[in-house]
């Protein structure tokens, strides 16, 4: 896309975001900076990206007819999936029927909408190293898979994210409740799950991999801390051996080359010494990549915007040791934030409040960011800033 138009005019370059959370919000901001007309869609009103878009729509993106109608109405030049819960078969059909441009491709969106498609591609088609795994549909199959793989192991719904429905099993007593949670906690309700063997890794990373007009570029590796399958902290760069980094880039290039298209991919990997295992990939900016808002000259969101528009990415510069820490809210209500000033008193500290309209249960509502001389210092500053901010929920 060599030419860009003017928003809200006949020449406008229109981008439709399918999913309007905090990551989509940052993508929308970067697209706005490049003069793109942004349309944001999600299943609920006033989602974060809707607050910075030119127009927004509330639809069930798993409804094929509603999705077709929205695309017909808006006539976007690019469709950018920002979440998994989309009727991706419709995108595949529209790509074939009308030449609809889906980022990175409709096939990539379909394969990565659940864990089965991408795991089978990585392990069985490409031969990439992964943990042992089995897919199960019933409790009997699940129990047989746990027995075959052994404890400890992990069970996840094939369609979920942010740790929803996910459990780590370390004892026989956890087998039954983990199945129940997998059937009730996933985004798509009860259904198929993956049981994975537990890899005794030293650390896990996200390798942000950008496919763009000039080739493939890699960001510095991002280390992260997960709790209950959900991101809590991330930092960049994660120290690792040159051999492990080379292997991580090799695996990331293999999976993203197969998925194709342009855009940023978040490739999750386990590392032990010089050994690297593939875990998952998202064909879009990654939550652990929020740290790049301060750690890189071009954040993951700016890189994604440039890549999908066909703009050059000559270099990715790092700004030094940096960290992020998630702000969490628990309960019911509208979030209010106290003591933001206290969090910002330390130099090289930043805060992003996502603007989520409400909280129901457990939700990430913001992030603190910090730069320092070392990773440990940056992590401590980001944590202290997050602890300083009190998140209050009101009716």
Curated annotation (Swiss-Prot):
User: What is the organism of origin for this protein?
Assistant: Stenotrophomonas maltophilia (strain K279a)
One Pfam family name is: PurT_C
Role this protein plays = Involved in the de novo purine biosynthesis. Catalyzes the transfer of formate to 5-phospho-ribosyl-glycinamide (GAR), producing 5-phospho-ribosyl-N-formylglycinamide (FGAR). Formate is provided by PurU via hydrolysis of 10-formyl-tetrahydrofolate.
Q: What is its EC number?
A: 6.3.1.21
What's the catalysed reaction? N(1)-(5-phospho-beta-D-ribosyl)glycinamide + formate + ATP = N(2)-formyl-N(1)-(5-phospho-beta-D-ribosyl)glycinamide + ADP + phosphate + H(+)
Q: Where do the annotations place N(1)-(5-phospho-beta-D-ribosyl)glycinamide binding?
A: 22-23, 82, 287, 356, 363-364
| Pathway note | Purine metabolism; IMP biosynthesis via de novo pathway; N(2)-formyl-N(1)-(5-phospho-D-ribosyl)glycinamide from N(1)-(5-phospho-D-ribosyl)glycinamide (formate route): step 1/1
| SS bond list | none
One record GO biological process: 'de novo' IMP biosynthetic process
In Swiss-Prot or TrEMBL terms, this protein is called: Formate-dependent phosphoribosylglycinamide formyltransferase
Classification via InterPro entries: ATP-grasp (IPR011761), ATP-grasp_carboxylate-amine (IPR003135), ATP_grasp_subdomain_1 (IPR013815), PreATP-grasp_dom_sf (IPR016185), PurT (IPR005862), PurT/PurK_preATP-grasp (IPR054350), PurT_C (IPR048740), Rudment_hybrid_motif (IPR011054)
């Amino acid at each position: 896309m060599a030419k860009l138009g003017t928003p809200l005019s006949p020449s406008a370059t229109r981008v439709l975001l399918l999913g309007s959370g905090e990551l989509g919000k940052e993508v929308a901001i970067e697209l706005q900076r490049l003069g793109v007309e942004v349309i944001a869609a999600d299943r609920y009103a006033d989602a974060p990206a809707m607050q910075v878009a030119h127009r927004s729509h509330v639809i069930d993106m798993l409804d094929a007819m509603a999705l077709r109608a929205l695309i017909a109405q808006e006539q976007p030049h690019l469709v950018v999936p920002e979440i998994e819960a989309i009727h991706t078969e419709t995108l595949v059909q529209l790509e074939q029927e009308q030449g609809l441009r889906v980022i990175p491709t409709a096939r990539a969106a379909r394969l990565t909408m659940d864990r089965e498609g991408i795991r089978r591609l990585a392990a069985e088609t490409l031969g990439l190293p992964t943990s042992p795994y089995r897919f199960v549909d019933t409790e009997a199959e699940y129990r047989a898979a746990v027995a075959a793989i052994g404890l400890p192991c992990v069970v996840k719904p094939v369609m979920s994210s942010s740790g929803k429905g996910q459990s780590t099993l370390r004892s026989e007593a956890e087998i039954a409740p983990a199945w129940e949670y997998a059937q009730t906690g996933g985004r798509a309700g009860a259904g198929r799950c993956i049981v994975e063997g537990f890899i005794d890794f030293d650390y896990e990373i996200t390798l942000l991999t950008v496919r763009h007009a000039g080739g493939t570029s890699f960001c510095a590796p991002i280390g992260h801390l997960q709790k209950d399958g959900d991101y809590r902290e991330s930092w960049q760069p994660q120290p690792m051996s040159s051999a492990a980094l080379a292997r991580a880039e090799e695996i990331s290039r293999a999976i993203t080359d197969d998925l194709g298209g342009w855009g940023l991919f978040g490739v999750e990997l386990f590392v032990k010494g010089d050994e690297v295992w593939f875990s998952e990939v998202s064909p879009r900016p990654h939550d652990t990549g929020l740290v790049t808002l301060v750690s890189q000259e071009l954040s993951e969101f700016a890189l994604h915007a440039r890549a999908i528009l066909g703009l050059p990415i000559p270099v990715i510069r790092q700004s030094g040791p940096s960290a992020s820490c998630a702000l969490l809210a628990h309960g019911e209500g509208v979030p209010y934030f106290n003591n933001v000033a206290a969090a910002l008193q330390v130099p090289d500290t930043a805060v992003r409040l996502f603007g989520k309209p409400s909280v129901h249960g457990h939700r990430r509502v913001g992030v603190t960011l910090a730069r320092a001389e070392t990773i440990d210092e940056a992590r401590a500053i980001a944590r202290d800033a997050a602890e300083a901010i009190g998140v209050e929920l009101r009716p």
